[in-house]
Each structure stands twice: as structure tokens, then as C-alpha cells.
Amino acid sequence: MCIRDSLIPPFRLPTDTKWGYQTIHKDGNLPKVERLMNEEMVLPFLEDVEWDLHPGAIASYGDWPVETREEFAYAANARLINIREACQSDKYNGIILLGGGEPGFLEARELCRNFKIVCTANAHSQMYLATMLGNKFSVIDISGVHNVYYRDLIYQHQLN
């Protein structure tokens, strides 16, 4: 069986954003390898996998990365539409949600389950991997709002 995954970011910022140095803002028409963040670290793990990189929906709340719960909700809503389209295309047997805050992850898992497609997200996977390495782990983020959001994700994933 061929593994075919779709990597779906939570959002995409306009190419002219002043926040481009730290987040997804590349032109959606570029080849997927050029749009993949941290490609030098990620590509070796995708060698035996057929994969697509969705360009992500343009952020509806502004031209900056998500900062508030409201903005996480907008990102989740936009991404769920892309996830449904990927599931309905019948091309994928895995959906990987990019972005640490994993907006819409629980909803995406529910949606993907209906199509018998595996779905995972960065924070969920990273936190569970961290528990395999030791008894404690830390999440470091520069935003106070994000710190509380990640704490809630830790509780949600029952890792407290």
C-alpha cells in the first residue's frame, strides 16, 4: 500500500506581510519543496512517502500569525474546509496538520475518521513523543496567550 499524505497548514499569510520572516507566507504557486518550512529537517522523513503540501487558506483575520483564541478559531474553520476537500478527494490515507497550536485538530480527527483517514497534528505528536523521552516536558512560546493555549492543549491531550 502506498502512503500518500496531505500536509495542511493552519493558514497562509499574504506574500507581502511584514511577518514573513517567522511564518508561512510563501506564494502558494511555488513547488511544494520550496514552501515546506524546515525542509532540510523534514524531507528525509518524507523520502518514501508520496505527499502534497496544501498552500493553506489566506488568514481571514489579518496579515499576522494567530495571536488570540478568536484567531485560532478562524484558522480552524478555514483549515477544516481544506481537510474536508482532501478527505473527499479520496487521494490520501493520512492528513498531517502543520502548526504548533493545532487549530481544529479534534474536529479534523472526527472528520477524517468518517473517511477512514489517519489525522495527526504537530503539538499532539510532539507532546506524546516528549513523554517517551522523559517524565516531564516544557512548551516554550513567546506569547502569553499562546502559553495558556498550550497549557489547555496539554490538559486536552491528558498529559498533565
List the predicted regions and their residue ranges.
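Short, acidic/small-residue loops that bind anionic groups at enzyme active sites
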Residues: 109-133
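Short, well-ordered alpha-helical microsegments
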Residues: 102-106, 126-127, 147
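Periplasmic-binding protein-like
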Residues: 92-99
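Short amphipathic alpha-helical segments
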Residues: 107-110, 151-152
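Short, well-structured alpha-helical segments in soluble
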Residues: 73-91
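N-terminal glycine-rich anion-binding loop in soluble enzyme alpha/beta folds
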Residues: 4-73, 142-160
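Nucleotide donor/acceptor-binding cores
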Residues: 4-5, 134-137
